[in-house]
Amino acid sequence: MAAKIRRDDEVIVLTGKDKGKRGKVKNVLSSGKVIIEGINLVKKHQKPVPALNQPGGIVEKEAAIQVSNVAIFNAATGKADRVGFRFEDGKKVRFFKSNSETIK
């Protein structure tokens, strides 16, 4: 099945501590999760790695969110939207369900 949320899509978080925040998808994991820029930040305790000249400390990084907890953001309507698929000129493309506009 084709992915409804893809890398570089702008999405909005539907549930959780970051509800309502928007961000760009950095990575889509095969486990049904996505990593979004600046969303779901967690503190990771990093050990120093002298061989790579990396210092230790507490680092903030993005954690994965379930893909069901985010929705693609439709800039035309300014709201979260659902994604559908259709064929145009022999190619399968994604479109917004609210206004039938093709997603780039």
Curated annotation (Swiss-Prot):
Pfam families: KOW (PF00467), ribosomal_L24 (PF17136). It comes from the Bacteria. Keywords: Ribonucleoprotein, Ribosomal protein, RNA-binding, rRNA-binding. GO terms for molecular function: rRNA binding; structural constituent of ribosome. One of its GO terms (cellular component) is ribosome. SMART domains: KOW. The keyword Ribosomal protein applies. Disulfide bonds: none annotated. InterPro entries: KOW, Rib_uL2_dom2, Ribosomal_uL24, Ribosomal_uL24_CS, Ribosomal_uL24_KOW, Translation_prot_SH3-like_sf. Part of the 50S ribosomal subunit. PANTHER family: MITOCHONDRIAL RIBOSOMAL PROTEIN L24. One of two assembly initiator proteins, it binds directly to the 5'-end of the 23S rRNA, where it nucleates assembly of the 50S subunit. Belongs to the universal ribosomal protein uL24 family. This is Large ribosomal subunit protein uL24. The lineage of its organism: Bacteria, Pseudomonadati, Pseudomonadota, Gammaproteobacteria, Enterobacterales.
